[in-house]
């Protein structure tokens, strides 16, 4: 099992590497300003693909494709997903038209990428994983971006195809190749591609409950770039690229988190949770110092000017990675209801604070509002898991936050560096920055 998930993590990492490469190619093609429009449109595509799943990717992970009624259930799910996709596509186009008036490279990309939302419905990763075909199940999810890169490299040299429309067509072609690969690898009957409209209401409700956690997080994640589009358009391209980088790291990490779902009640699962969170905290605090030192030594004046914006985003990403491990532990213990309450409360506070900051055209408070609310969610999740931070864990967290708070000046940076000493001591002495709440802290 571990080997299967490790191979899945490697495949996911390769897929995310291709996603980053595609974004870099778009950045080179359109420049900072143009990439802001196209990158936001691509983010919309990913949002539609995720929301239109309706939780069925999780639901069909636990269903046997060999069961008698599986084909009927799959076709009913396909009907629900098709309706959701069409509704989301309509809302996406209407929102983009209202924002851009139907002009610009971003809107052209959107229209050309619309077929990808329908082609994305043809995916058999969940039933492949349910069959135990883990390598195939992980692999068929990562075909679209390599194919899109190949198509874009071919199209952008042709007259009339070098703009947003050509990039969108390349993405649609990538998802077409992925759909064909899914059909070929899974080898199911052709009628799986035909939606069935009758029934499936109870199944839909189950899928939506399973996806509630992911939907809440995705909607919250997508809010920030849309607010930055008006509050700080110059920073938006950088934020989008950082988002893809952090999202890729989070996705790779989640391949390991899935093991916690089966081992949440066992001592190995609990130790793994403590080890992973400790590793993320320690490396994040150390990495923040490395970023600051590298920027000071080799960064240009323009790059250093963006550091007060970049550091809170990176700190938020590090805390999200830790929170993902804690969430997997809670879901494995069947405490997703408690986790959902924490997420809804934290995301609601974050959204309100971000909206207020955007209304005042205060992008830095917007980024810090998001960071602090995500931190609050992580702390609450830590409590729900029955875990506490050792002094070294507190030091790592404070070091990360101080490194992100560049408005404190050199004093904050020095204090953040000094705090790495107790982090190193705790990691060496206890092999962990956390301990179970029922234990007396050593």
Describe the role of every protein-language-model region.
Residues 4-19, 144-145, 167-186, 190, ...:
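Transmembrane helical elements of multi-pass membrane transporters/channels
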Residues 52-68, 130, 242-278, 329-332:
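Helix-loop junctions and terminal segments of transmembrane helices
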Residues 30-40, 66-78, 86-116, 158-168, ...:
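Membrane-interface helix-capping segments at transmembrane helix termini in multi-pass transporters
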Residues 1-54, 149, 208-231, 419-424:
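Signature of the first transmembrane helix
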Residues 117-140, 263-265, 315-345, 385-387:
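Membrane-interface junctions at transmembrane-helix termini in multi-pass inner-membrane proteins
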């Amino acid at each position: 099992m571990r080997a299967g998930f490790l191979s899945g993590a490697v495949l996911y990492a390769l897929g995310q590497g291709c996603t980053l490469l595609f974004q870099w190619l778009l950045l080179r093609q359109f420049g900072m300003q143009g990439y802001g429009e196209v990158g936001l449109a691509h983010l919309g595509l990913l949002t539609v693909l995720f929301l239109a799943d309706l939780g069925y990717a999780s639901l069909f992970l636990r269903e046997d494709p060999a069961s008698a009624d599986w084909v009927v259930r799959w076709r009913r799910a396909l009907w629900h997903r098709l309706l959701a996709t069409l509704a989301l596509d309509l809302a996406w186009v209407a929102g983009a038209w209202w924002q851009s008036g139907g002009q610009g490279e971003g809107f052209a990309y959107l229209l050309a990428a619309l077929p990808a939302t329908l082609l994305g419905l043809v995916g058999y990763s969940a039933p492949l994983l349910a069959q135990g075909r883990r390598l195939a199940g992980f692999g068929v999810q990562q075909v679209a971006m390599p194919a899109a890169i190949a198509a874009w490299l071919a199209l952008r040299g042709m007259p009339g195809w070098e703009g947003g429309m050509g990039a969108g067509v390349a993405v649609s072609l990538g998802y077409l190749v992925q759909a064909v690969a899914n059909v070929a690898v899974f080898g199911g009957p052709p009628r799986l591609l035909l939606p069935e409209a009758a029934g499936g209401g109870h199944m839909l409700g189950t899928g939506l409950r399973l996806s509630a956690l992911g939907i809440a997080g995705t909607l919250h994640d997508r809010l920030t770039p849309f607010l930055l589009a008006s509050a700080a358009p110059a920073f938006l391209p950088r934020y989008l690229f950082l988002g893809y980088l952090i999202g890729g790291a989070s996705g790779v990490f989640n391949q390991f988190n899935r093991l916690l779902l089966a081992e949440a009640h066992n001592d190995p699962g609990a130790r793994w949770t403590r080890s992973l969170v400790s590793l993320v905290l320690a490396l994040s605090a150390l990495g923040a110092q490395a970023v600051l030192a590298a920027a000071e030594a080799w960064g240009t004046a323009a790059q250093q000017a963006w550091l007060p914006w970049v550091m809170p985003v990176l700190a938020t990403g590090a805390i999200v990675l830790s929170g993902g491990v804690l969430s997997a532990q809670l879901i494995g213990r069947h405490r997703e209801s408690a986790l959902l309450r924490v997420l809804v409360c934290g995301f609601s506070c974050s959204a309100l604070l971000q909206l207020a900051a955007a209304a005042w055209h205060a992008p830095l408070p917007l980024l810090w509002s998001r960071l602090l609310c995500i931190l609050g969610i992580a702390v609450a999740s830590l409590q729900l898991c029955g875990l506490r931070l050792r002094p070294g864990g507190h030091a790592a967290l404070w070091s990360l936050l101080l490194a992100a708070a560049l408005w404190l000046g050199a004093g904050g940076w020095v204090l953040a560096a000094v705090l790495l000493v107790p982090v190193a001591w705790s990691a060496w002495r206890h092999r962990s920055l956390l301990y179970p709440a029922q234990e007396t802290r050593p």
